Amino acid sequence: MIKQRTLKRIVQATGVGLHTGKKVTLTLRPASANTGVIYRRTDLNPPVDFPADAKSVRDTMLCTCLVNEHDVRISTVEHLNAALAGLGIDNIIVEVDAPEIPIMDGSASPFVYLLLDAGIEELNSAKKFLRLKQAVRVEDGDKWAELAPYNGFTLDFTIDFKHPAIDASSQRYFLNFSAESFVRQISRARTFGFMRDIEYLQSRGLALGGSFDCAIVVDDYRVLNEDGLRFEDEFVRHKMLDAIGDLFMFGHNIIGAFTAFKSGHAMNNKLLQAVLARQEAWELVTFEDEAKLPLAFKAPSFVMV
């Protein structure tokens, strides 16, 4: 039986909030089978839980938020959610003493290392996957995103940025997903933004944690970070990272092929909601026999330590 995963032990880290610029303490806790992914704000009394749920997602200019029925929100969940998807973590309590997850370096890599430091434990309960039975596509003008049946998980993402720093040849990326390929090829790709946008937001008391330490910053001509890019196609790789996190908002790894053109958080979420709304287009499956599990989800040795 392919089993659900959680953490072996509690781990903690501190970082800066993108919105407030203030220190945030992040605590990751193991959770029992079928708990799912739960984000928790401990700065509120009593603490407020936000189960990962496609319908709770709100897209803002800066990040992805989860919002409950009382309009209480937790922000900047997308990069940690991508790390959970990448390592196939089914059950976890994510606590922060702030309204947001810390931005760290703007990628998912610090979260991957934190999760691996905690260690990953299998639970005696079958892991559920969302498997596509029919193709589902959403569009908005020239932007679109699609999930289609495929016995594995692939992502094919194209961006269309007219900018001197983003070469035309580095605007499309294809990934045959596995935990290894996610960690090596996607998790280190950082979020990006324009210097003028960051300055404007900070003048209005927003994005106070935004800096060269947590994003690729560009002006009209070039990348301003002294160290440059981690990959020549880091921009599109980060958009793929975002998509992996967005599509995991249902709490289950997806068996299917994802293709997108100029998609972002809102479009990715619209696609996930469209899939879930069409009950004939998908099914939840478990695997008693590991031989039948798509290669994409075989547990690599570095994860199951």
Swiss-Prot record:
List of residues binding Zn(2+): H79, H238, D242
This protein's pathway: Glycolipid biosynthesis; lipid IV(A) biosynthesis; lipid IV(A) from (3R)-3-hydroxytetradecanoyl-[acyl-carrier-protein] and UDP-N-acetyl-alpha-D-glucosamine: step 2/6
EC number(s) given by UniProt: 3.5.1.108
Taxonomic superkingdom: Bacteria
Listed GO biological process terms: lipid A biosynthetic process
Keywords: Hydrolase, Lipid A biosynthesis, Lipid biosynthesis, Lipid metabolism, Metal-binding, Zinc
Catalyzed chemical reaction(s): a UDP-3-O-[(3R)-3-hydroxyacyl]-N-acetyl-alpha-D-glucosamine + H2O = a UDP-3-O-[(3R)-3-hydroxyacyl]-alpha-D-glucosamine + acetate
Cofactor field: Zn(2+)
Pfam families xref list: LpxC (PF03331)
Cellular component GO terms held in the UniProt record: membrane
PANTHER family on file: UDP-3-O-ACYL-N-ACETYLGLUCOSAMINE DEACETYLASE 1, MITOCHONDRIAL-RELATED
Homology family: Belongs to the LpxC family.
Chain's role: Catalyzes the hydrolysis of UDP-3-O-myristoyl-N-acetylglucosamine to form UDP-3-O-myristoylglucosamine and acetate, the committed step in lipid A biosynthesis.
HAMAP family (alphabetical): LpxC
Protein known as: UDP-3-O-acyl-N-acetylglucosamine deacetylase
Gene: lpxC
